[in-house]
Amino acid sequence: MDKGEDEQGAYHQDLIEQLKAPLKRCTNKCYCKCCCYHCQLCFLQKGLGVTYHAPRIRRKKIAPLDRFPEQKQSISTRGRDSQTTQKGQEKVETSARTAPSLGRKNLAQQSGRATGASD
């Protein structure tokens, strides 16, 4: 039984030495389960995503350019064709004045009866 205990003790010591040994560079770039767990370095880098190298340099974010600068003009005069839109508005206003809608008074005049009176 001493032989079995000695082998088991030697096995444990071997495992501890492997853990304390410096990590060797692994050139395997596969991320399958078998390759992620085949050595301690691959487990740390591929399995857990832990890397101990200098972080990559990140560019500073540049302030966004003013795409819509504040304009001192009113909203109605900002458009490209401000003159044509004003002409179009005048046409709409004149057409509304020339063709009044039929209301209660106009209906009464057309029918010849007073509105609201019943026979």
Swiss-Prot record:
Residues 26-42 are annotated as: Cysteine-rich. A motif (Nuclear localization signal, and RNA-binding (TAR)) lies at residues 54-60. Keywords: Activator, Host nucleus, Host-virus interaction, RNA-binding, Transcription, Transcription regulation. It is found in: Host nucleus, Host nucleolus. Residues 61-119 are annotated as: Disordered. GO terms for biological process: positive regulation of viral transcription. InterPro entries: IV_Tat (IPR001831), Tat_dom_sf (IPR036963). The keyword Transcription applies. It comes from the Viruses. Pfam families: Tat. Residues 43-53 are annotated as: Core. GO terms for molecular function: RNA binding; RNA-binding transcription regulator activity. The keyword Transcription applies. Residues 71-87, 107-119 have a biased composition (Polar residues). Transcriptional activator that increases RNA Pol II processivity, thereby increasing the level of full-length viral transcripts. Recognizes a hairpin structure at the 5'-LTR of the nascent viral mRNAs referred to as the transactivation responsive RNA element (TAR) and recruits the cyclin T1-CDK9 complex (P-TEFb complex) that will in turn hyperphosphorylate the RNA polymerase II to allow efficient elongation. The CDK9 component of P-TEFb and other Tat-activated kinases hyperphosphorylate the C-terminus of RNA Pol II that becomes stabilized and much more processive. Extracellular circulating Tat can be endocytosed by surrounding uninfected cells via the binding to several surface receptors. Endosomal low pH allows Tat to cross the endosome membrane to enter the cytosol and eventually further translocate into the nucleus, thereby inducing severe cell dysfunctions ranging from cell activation to cell death. Through. This is Protein Tat. It comes from Simian immunodeficiency virus agm.vervet (isolate AGM3) (SIV-agm.ver). The lineage of its organism: Viruses, Riboviria, Pararnavirae, Artverviricota, Revtraviricetes.
